[in-house]
Each structure stands twice: as C-alpha cells, then as structure tokens.
Amino acid sequence: MTLLVGLGNPTLRYAHTRHNAGFDILDSLVSELDLSFTFSSKHNAYLCVYKDFILLKPQTYMNLSGESVLSAKNFYKPKELLIVHDDLDLPLGVVRFKKGGGNGGHNGLKSIDLLCSNSYYRLRVGISKGIDVIEHVLSKFHKNEEPLKNAVFEHAKNALKFFIESHDFNAMQNRFTLKKPLIIES
C-alpha cells in the first residue's frame, strides 16, 4: 500500500492558490478516475482509496500537515509515502521528483519531517518565487500563468497515474521530470 498525499490549505479562501498545488493535482486525478474523496475525522483529512493507494488531503492547514499524515501512516501502515507539493524554489513549469532530503523551508514538509521523518518520495511542482513568500504562496496564479499551470498540473497528474499503474518511482522520475519549464504552444 502507498500513501499518496497532496498538500494544501483547507477552506475556500485558499482554493486554487499556489500553496494548494498538491490538493489541485489530487482533485484532478480523483476526478479523472471517476472517484471522490470522503472526509475522515479520524485522520482530519479527505481520503480516497484506489487500488492499493490511499490518497489523502490533510485538513489541518499546511503547517500541521504532519498530524494527518502521521495518523494515516500509523493506521494504514503504507510501504511507501509520496507527497505532492508546491516548490517556490522551482520555476513555474518545472516538475521534479526526490527521495528524502531537506524541506526547503516548506512548512508542510517541515511538519511531516518532524512527525514522520524525511525519507519519503516527493513530487515537486514549481510555483516560482515571489518577493513576499507568504503573500506569494497564498496567492492565486495570474491569468497569464494559467495555461502553463494547467499544463504542468496535467503533467503531474499523468505522472501519478503512471506511478499508480507501475509502482515504480524511478521510472516515473525518469519519464516525467521537467528540468526546464514546460513549453506551451499557442
């Protein structure tokens, strides 16, 4: 079993902000698979079970994401953990994968690292860096960024679909890494 976590902040106030990239990508995946999330008060998260994957969207706010992840991890005992999250150190249009390592100042990852360790897989989606970090991550994408954001989120969703079928992180990493921003043709 694999625990697949999309990071974000709950409530409509934060819907579709840069920091909610993980939520948006998991929502798109679940929608395409014609499934739905149900709320689990036990884990304070929305859950969706598909094959041998538990998809999880913590409802604790970003800085406490580790609480939901730890609860689900202790209950389901997954063999693997994959976190889908925004990364402001990567330009918009870039997707990278990583196993373990530092949290890059990402408070959701800090919370998970503190409670669960940092030896998990990551799907990192670039959101670019703004002048004011907090204002930037909590802002929505600009209208001129939408086509690129949509293409990158679609790419990340396809990477997750591939991972669900293959169970092969290295193959997903090799096939779906975008080291340079995705080029959108008009």
From Swiss-Prot:
Keywords: Cytoplasm, Hydrolase, RNA-binding, tRNA-binding. One of its GO terms (cellular component) is cytoplasm. The record marks D86 as: Stabilizes the basic form of H active site to accept a proton. PROSITE patterns: PEPT_TRNA_HYDROL_1, PEPT_TRNA_HYDROL_2. The keyword tRNA-binding applies. TRNA binds at Y14, Y61, N63, N107. Hydrolyzes ribosome-free peptidyl-tRNAs (with 1 or more amino acids incorporated), which drop off the ribosome during protein synthesis, or as a result of ribosome stalling. This is Peptidyl-tRNA hydrolase.
